[in-house]
């Protein structure tokens, strides 16, 4: 199961003792700062976690999968995320039993 903003609010409430309104405001403001930075064309670098960057993609040819008709895919700007070294190391260090547990939680088999 994916971590949601509501889950983050609940963790801030239970682990840090913030009231739910303040915890929600903190989570919302955190994402708003990231969004505003990206909207202004600036990258976001979170030490120990990773980087959000903007990338411009050129127009390219595509194909309609139903009809096979060739159609242009327009140029656009996309957000990319690259995990930092610490985050990569933490994920790679997961033991096999932990991975199985995570898979079971994700599929609801726990």
Curated annotation (Swiss-Prot):
State any GO CC term. cytosol
- Pfam (any one): Bac_DNA_binding
GO MF, one example = DNA binding
SMART domains assigned to the protein according to its UniProt record, in alphabetical order: BHL
**Record key words, sorted:** DNA recombination, DNA-binding, Transcription, Transcription regulation, Translation regulation
GO biological process assignments: DNA recombination; positive regulation of metabolic process; regulation of DNA-templated transcription; regulation of translation
Superkingdom, according to UniProt? Answer: Bacteria
Concerning InterPro entries, the annotation shows: Hist_DNA-bd, Histone-like_DNA-bd_CS, IHF-like_DNA-bd_dom_sf, IHF_alpha
Record note on quaternary structure: Heterodimer of an alpha and a beta chain.
- Biological function: This protein is one of the two subunits of integration host factor, a specific DNA-binding protein that functions in genetic recombination as well as in transcriptional and translational control.
HAMAP family under this entry?
Answer: IHF_alpha
Family membership: Belongs to the bacterial histone-like protein family.
Write down what this protein is called.
Integration host factor subunit alpha
Native organism = Methylococcus capsulatus (strain ATCC 33009 / NCIMB 11132 / Bath)
């Amino acid at each position: 199961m994916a971590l949601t903003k509501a889950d983050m609010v609940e963790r801030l409430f239970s682990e840090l003792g913030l009231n739910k309104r303040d915890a929600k405001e903190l989570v919302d403001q955190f994402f708003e700062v990231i969004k505003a930075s990206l909207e202004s064309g600036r990258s976001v670098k979170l030490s120990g976690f990773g980087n959000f960057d903007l990338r411009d993609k050129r127009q390219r040819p595509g194909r309609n999968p139903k009809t096979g008709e060739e159609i242009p895919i327009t140029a656009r700007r996309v957000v990319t995320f690259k995990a930092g070294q610490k985050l990569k190391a933490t994920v790679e260090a997961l033991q096999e039993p932990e991975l199985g547990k995570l898979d079971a939680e994700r599929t609801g088999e726990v």
